[in-house]
Each structure stands twice: as C-alpha cells, then as structure tokens.
Amino acid sequence: MNDLSREDLLQKIRLLELENAKLKESKSAVSTVSDQYEYDAKYPKIDEYFSSDEYKRYGRQMIVPQFGSLISQVKLKKSKVLFIGAGGLGCPALLYLSASGVGEIGIIDDDLVDISNLHRQVLHTTESVGIHKCESAKRYINKLNPHVKVNTYPFRLSNDNAFDIIEKYDLILDCTDTPATRYLINDVSVICGKTIVSGSGLKTDGQLSILNFHGIGPCYRCFYPKPPSPGSVTSCSDGGVVGPAIGLIGITMALEAIKVITDFYTDETFKPFLSMYSGYPQQQIRVFKMRNKQANCAVCGNNPTVLKSTISDNDIDYAEFCGRVNPNVLAPELRISVQEYHNYINSSQGENSILIDVRPKEQYEITKLPNSINIAWDPTFIKADNIDSYLPSNFDKNTNTFVMCRYGNDSQMATKKLIENFGFNEVKDIKGGINKWSKEIDSKIPQY
C-alpha cells in the first residue's frame, strides 16, 4: 500500500474530527430529552415565551426603549449564534451575549487554555489551564445562564467542516486573529447567506465591522480583495495586547450582534461602517463610513469565482492565498542552537564575541542575557543605514557576533541585514531566541 501524503493524512484527520463532532451531537441529542424534562420542571413557563426566572433575568434590558421590549427578547431566545474563537474577543462577547439570553451558542476553537491567556480571556480561570477553550467557556456559560444551549467544536475551522457548522447558525461572530481564517469565515458565510460581526484587536487598539449584512452589505473581500503581506501581520503573542482594550471590542461585538438579531438594523437603515478604538493616549472611538458591496468581489459579486465547490474540494488553500512566512530565512550554517551558544560563551573564545538582542525595548526590559546590547529590529534595524552608534567604539566587523530575539524570527532578518547591508563577516542567529534559552538553558529567565 502506498504511503499517504501529509495532505492526505491531514484530510483524514479533519474528516475524523468532523465525524467525531457529529457522533457527539447525536449522543447529545439522546441525553437532551431527559435534560429538557429536568429543565422544564425547574423553570416552568408562565406563558408561551419565558419562565418567571427569565422575565426577572432579562427584565432590565427589555424595558430599554432602544432594545425593543418583549419581541426583541423572543428574537434573542430563538437565535443561534456561532462564535469562531474563544479568546480575547470571543470571551467578552460570549459573556454578554449568553447573559443577554441568546438561545443557542456554538463555539469553535481548537486551542487549549494557557496561563498567558488569563489576563484578557475572562471566561477562563486558572483551573481551566490545559483544557479546550470552548469547553472552558461552556462551563462558565452554563453557570451564568442555564437557559442557553451551548455546542462546542474543539477543532480548527477548515474547508472540510466550515459549511456543515456555519450553515446551522443565524449569525457568525468572527473572533479570530489570522487573515487565512477570516477569509474562510467570510467566504463560507457569504455563500450560506449569514451576517458576520467581525472584530480584531492588538496592543491597545481594535476595530469592528458588520459584514455581508442580510446578503446586501459588503463582505470582507469587498474591503480587502488581497490579503496583507505575511510579514505585516502581528499576533498577540508578538505584539502584545492590553486586556481591557480587546475586551471592549468583544463587548461592542456583542452589542452589534444584539442589534442585528433584534432587527434594530434593517435593509433600509443599515450603512456599512468600521469602528476603530484607540485606548492610548486618550480613549476614543471613531466610526468610518465604508464602501458598499462591490460588483467585482470574488465571492459576493456579480460573477463570483469563490464557490462552495471550490472551497469544499480544497481548490482554495487559504494559507497559501494569504502567504506563508518562511520560518527559515537563513542558511543552516548561519544559525546555532541555544546549547551551542551556551557552550561557546563559556569557552575561551566567548570573551571576544558580542550578543545583539533585537527585541523591542519593552521586552528587553523584562529580561535579558548578561552583556547583551539591545538594538530593536523594529524600528531601528529596519530603518537604519548602519548601527555603528550602538556598538562599542573599538568594534571590529570581523568580531564573532550573535543575534537573539524572542522566538528566533526577527533575529534571522537582523542577521541577514548585518551580513548583506552592514558588512558584518562573522554573524550567527540563535535559534528559538530567549524563549528557547529559558526552556533549555536557564529557567530563571522568565517566559512571557
């Protein structure tokens, strides 16, 4: 029998994940009947809509004129909302939408709770570390509001499962942070006729928009026909994020979702917009009018080229479409391991070398290796014609020079520039950066 290719194996894994999810759903359906009897006994309805508990629970929002009284609460209860991502955006949005009385929620996220998530992902607790985020979120929601049904999908959204999942829900909340996933969510939602509430956040800023509103509003591809270059995309782990800033975006996503579900927006009154939030120096929210649906859009335009078949058949590789960052910019001989560097600096040759740390100043101030020099990749290395002013006055470009960053990515680019632009002759990148140093050499160096 021929060996399966990596792509074939991944395809089989994705199909097995989907089959497993369907089996869980069927098993859940069996237990749901008895659960429903127990629920009905505990919360008997006092009319065709709600129990006494629900009237008390939601009363404070039903009396708000803009909300829309009883009929809007009924619309919330009948709605099914899918959250793609249970992280910094998804957690606050889940918290407020489940509390508001959405009837059924789906959560898809293949990630596990990590302690580094807890400062901003407010549904997860210290006890949740190590379990799937969607399961952690479900536990919290079940305690918060027993009237909400929660479905979990502890795997990654893909071409193979996206249609089966998204078509079950009325509204999609895109709480992800990668362009490839955003394009997949957009394309499948447009084809399925679903409105998307989309948010993003990084550092102290964030933005929010409503996409494909009732099929008449612009979609993500209308705004961004081409993805950003891979090198320009910064993740939370690289760029950092202040919890309340991204939390505010998640909360506003929940409010916009309520407005969509309760028909506050209509086909006549909805205008495409982009809300942009800045947390520093002075908090502000600016709202920009966006262009309408584009006739030449690849998925929602007059002659679409992105179709259900092209997605389901994996004719579109979203990671390839958005570009892949090459993890190995340098030739192998220009890189060394942390152990090799450790051995070198503890040898007789180590005294005649220099270590350049290219992390941002804020990261360098958290922790650093002794005798290193901080010259940040961005903005210093990127913009500089030379770095002579940062180096000792007697520095010789034949000196053995080592370059370190946080994970071993920026340091490769800096090493390349030192050789090609600055004329350094003996330069090596330290693979894995200071994070790897902490794991393998010195655990007293904190991982952050």
UniProtKB/Swiss-Prot annotation:
GO biological process, one term: tRNA wobble position uridine thiolation
Molecular functions per Gene Ontology: adenylyltransferase activity; ATP binding; metal ion binding; thiosulfate-cyanide sulfurtransferase activity; URM1 activating enzyme activity
Binding locations of ATP: 88, 109, 116-120, 133, 177-178
Ranges of residues in domain Rhodanese: 349-446
SUPFAM superfamilies named among the record's database cross-references: Activating enzymes of the ubiquitin-like proteins
Cofactor note text: Binds 1 zinc ion per subunit.
Chain positions recorded as Zn(2+) binding sites: 219, 222, 297, 300
Annotated metabolic or biological route of this protein: tRNA modification; 5-methoxycarbonylmethyl-2-thiouridine-tRNA biosynthesis
A Pfam family: ThiF
UniProt name for this protein: Adenylyltransferase and sulfurtransferase UBA4
